[in-house]
């Protein structure tokens, strides 16, 4: 096995979309039953990927506007962002492109973003929608469309409660850092065209 590599993974997104629950579900295989606003301590875990040891540093951020000035301090040195929205909150879905992507591109240009749809277990929950008449479910197609719009390399829907696809979210984050998309070659070819002054 090779020496371990550190990857800093930062979660961002609106308040109450399930960022902290996603991290707790991944790191402890449990789901907190009460809403706990961002109390997840920064966490570090060794993960084996393709025979390589990865030291995965997980950073949680608060989505509420009160933290707009402090939150970007967490972005320094980030290797990848998990940008989360709730699959039962149209506002959080819309804020991905309105608020979060501009903020991330400003403070951390070039850092890849994995788009994450949370609360998958609630999307088909009739009781949830009966109790929340204003809630609008976000379809997989809408998530894929948003992924293309923001240029994210991956879009994953998950449920921290049932743990469905939770590991896949973090696997995708690690993979995009270890094997970045190969679109830089095209740019190099364009820049190789010379300029002649006669």
Swiss-Prot record:
Residues 196-198 form a propeptide. It is found in: Cytoplasm; Cell membrane. Keywords: Auxin signaling pathway, Cell membrane, Cytoplasm, GTP-binding, Lipoprotein, Membrane, Methylation, Nucleotide-binding, Palmitate, Prenylation. InterPro entries: P-loop_NTPase (IPR027417), Small_GTP-bd (IPR005225), Small_GTPase (IPR001806), Small_GTPase_Rho (IPR003578). The modification Cysteine methyl ester is found at residue 195. GO terms for biological process: anisotropic cell growth; auxin-activated signaling pathway; cortical microtubule organization; petal morphogenesis; positive gravitropism; regulation of auxin mediated signaling pathway; root hair elongation; root hair initiation. A motif (Effector region) lies at residues 35-43. Gene3D superfamilies: P-loop containing nucleotide triphosphate hydrolases (3.40.50.300). SMART domains: RAB, RAS, RHO. It is a peripheral membrane protein. It comes from the Eukaryota. GO terms for cellular component: cytoplasm; nucleolus; nucleus; plasma membrane; site of polarized growth; spindle. GTP binds at residues 13-21, 31-38, 60-64, 118-121. Ubiquitous. Preferentially expressed at the tip of root hairs. The keyword Plastid does not apply. GO terms for molecular function: GDP binding; GTP binding; GTPase activity. A lipid is attached at residue 195 (S-geranylgeranyl cysteine). Inactive GDP-bound Rho GTPases reside in the cytosol, are found in a complex with Rho GDP-dissociation inhibitors (Rho GDIs), and are released from the GDI protein in order to translocate to membranes upon activation. Involved in cell polarity control during the actin-dependent tip growth of root hairs, thus regulating root hair length and root hair initiation. Contributes, in a SPK1-dependent manner, to the prevention of cortical microtubules organization into parallel arrays oriented perpendicular to the axis of cell elongation to limit anisotropic cell growth during petal development. NCBIfam families: small_GTP (TIGR00231). Belongs to the small GTPase superfamily. Rho family. Interacts with Rho GDP-dissociation inhibitor 1 and ICR1. Binds to SPK1 when in the inactive GDP-bound form. This is Rac-like GTP-binding protein ARAC3. It comes from Arabidopsis thaliana.
